[in-house]
Regions:
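Helix-loop junctions at membrane interfaces in 12-TM secondary transporters
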Residues: 101-114, 317-329
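Glycine-rich segments within core transmembrane alpha-helices of 12-TM secondary carriers
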Residues: 145-167, 364-374
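Multi-pass alpha-helical transporter architecture, strongest
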Residues: 191-202, 393-418
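Helix-loop boundary and gating motifs at the non-cytosolic
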Residues: 5-63, 235-267, 271-274
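A membrane-interface helix-boundary motif in multi-pass transporters
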Residues: 48-51, 167-190, 380-399
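Helix-to-loop junctions at the C-terminal end of transmembrane segments
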Residues: 68-82, 284-298
């Protein structure tokens, strides 16, 4: 009976496969792309401290734009027949941008293309996350969401290992590293698009609002109404505030891990292999958290992940040697998938299903949009002190605040049930 309960359906499997595809792009952005940018920046005379700062500023631009567009597109996507086409638009922007990054040969155009590609990727996640309520039932959401992240972590290793061997072994086959990185970006884009095809074929929007006249204008009206009355649902309100804080730190660590290690002067090959270990460790860890969700509510598991990340941020403050980065990579892998998957499914269960796109637009503001603050903390802290450790270590305060606010949300939920 237990196995039958958690047997993945074809539609759920297609949804999970998109995590496998887009996670390859995430891994590329976290590993090889910063190295590509570092090479271009060095050729352009950019210092190591400013290299980290410019990378952080570019990430901040992405999150601000995503924060503005996310709820607007999400609200529009709740309209019958809109979600899938807008998802496809964002997907193609991301995939084409991934290919185009390889054509850049100076650091500034590269950053511009990176921003466009990352906006397309982030936009696609608004619709992808909101599809969870269409592809599965509330009691299966924790498990399906966890499996999405789990298979995303391990599946993304397939193209990444190919790309890593190509880049590290480029000299042995008479190829320049820049050419190898260009090919690696193309491989990633093809993988991302290919693994999305089953979802494009199978997905049908189940929860929606009917088509209205002036649909775009009405989407603004609906989101205005939701924002106006958001505080009335205190469970959702306090959760979003908590999520804004703790996931900010999570995404900042993901976005800037390689850039941080490079700024500290750590060995490039060691950094890449350490981050590959993160993906491998994250696979069983996410599955474990998914199984734990069958015994313990997400309201108990999420605080465990937040507390662990607080310790990780403090540890990063003292990081100076490569073996410490390996420890950091393992620790991040243990809790990264759990906090992301459980937060997504927890939110999906406490919002109106027919307004999933609208609410996940807000979720995206408080998620990837929130990492504007974290990346700015790292960038400004690094430039003011001349030390990357200070900037990265200071994000621990975001996890502490997020932990407290999440407990407030849980108490609100308990009061509502009573």
């Amino acid at each position: 009976m237990q196995k039958k309960k958690f047997k993945i359906t074809p539609l759920e499997r297609a949804w999970i496969l998109y995590d496998v595809g887009n996670s390859a792009f995430v891994l590329m952005i976290a590993t090889l792309v910063p190295i590509f940018f570092n090479a271009l920046a060095e050729a352009g005379g950019v210092s190591k401290v400013n290299y980290l700062a410019y990378w952080g500023y570019a990430s901040s631009v992405v999150t601000v734009v995503t924060a503005v567009l996310g709820p607007i597109l999400g609200t529009l996507a709740d309209t019958k027949g809109f979600k899938k086409p807008i998802f496809m638009l964002c997907l193609f922007v991301g995939v084409l941008g991934c290919c185009a990054m390889g054509a850049a040969r100076t650091w500034l155009p590269f950053l511009v293309i990176f921003i466009v590609a990352k906006i397309g990727f982030s936009g696609s996640l608004v619709f992808y996350d909101s599809m969870l309520g269409d592809v599965t039932t509330p009691e299966r959401m924790d498990m399906v969401s966890s499996r999405g992240y789990a298979w995303g972590y391990i599946g993304s290793c397939v193209p990444f290992v190919v790309c890593l061997v190509l880049v590290l072994g480029s000299g042995a086959i008479g190829m320049s590293q820049m050419t190898a990185l260009t090919i690696a970006l193309f491989i990633t884009a093809v993988w991302w698009l290919g693994t999305t095809l089953p979802l494009l074929r199978r997905y049908r929007q189940v929860n929606y609002v009917e088509v209205e006249q002036h649909a775009i204008r009405q989407s603004f009206v609906r989101i205005g109404h939701t924002l106006k009355h958001l505080y009335e649902d205190k469970q959702v309100f306090w959760f979003l505030l908590a999520f804004f804080c703790y996931i900010d730190g999570v995404y900042t660590i993901i976005d800037m891990a390689t850039a941080y290690g490079t700024a500290l002067g750590l060995d490039t090959t060691g950094l890449l292999l350490a981050l590959l270990v993160t993906q491998i460790v994250a696979f069983p860890s996410a599955l474990i958290f998914g199984r734990l969700s069958a015994k313990y509510p997400s309201s108990q598991l999420i605080p465990v992940c937040i507390a662990a990340y607080t310790g990780i941020a403090v540890f990063a403050f003292f990081l100076t040697q490569q073996w410490q980065f390996w420890v950091l990579a393992v620790l991040v892998g243990m809790f990264q998938g759990g906090v992301q998957a459980l937060s997504r499914s927890h939110f999906a269960k406490i919002i109106p299903a027919e307004k999933s796109g609208e609410y996940f637009g807000l979720f995206d503001i408080c998620g990837k949009g929130a990492s504007f603050l974290g990346t700015m903390i790292v960038s400004v802290g690094s430039q003011l002190t001349g030390s990357a450790n200070v900037g990265v270590g200071s994000i621990a305060v975001l996890f502490v605040i997020g932990f407290v606010l999440f407990r407030v949300s849980c108490r609100t939920e308990h009061a509502k049930q009573v």
